[in-house]
Amino acid sequence: MELKPGSRWKSAVCDTEVVVVRPPKAEASLECGGYPVIAHAEARPEGKAIAEGFTDGSQAGKRYADEETGMEVLCTKTGQGTLTIGGRPIGAKEAKKLPASD
């Protein structure tokens, strides 16, 4: 799986869809719901369900980043699966506060 900036991916087991904002510094496996993500154009495989322990969900409009790999993705469609890299959950980035203007 080549995670290029702008490439679109979706979960194999839920409705989550993401766009890569920053690719990983080295080879990494992006997963959702306990399974590797698939290319946006591919059909979801039949009979798979979200793996136990990977049901925290993802929220549309949020950026998810992993400091270890440098990877950042933007969630474009909400789903029930947890976004992970190599089985390690990645968290949503906090929005930066804008400076006060007069």
Segments (PLM) and residue ranges:
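Long, hydrophobic N-terminal alpha-helical segment
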Residues: M1-D15
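A short, compositionally biased
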Residues: E2-P5, G57-A60, K77-T78
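A low-complexity, Ser/Thr/Gly/Pro-enriched, surface-exposed linker/loop concept
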Residues: P24-D56, I90-K97
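Short, compact, well-ordered microdomains
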Residues: A65-L98
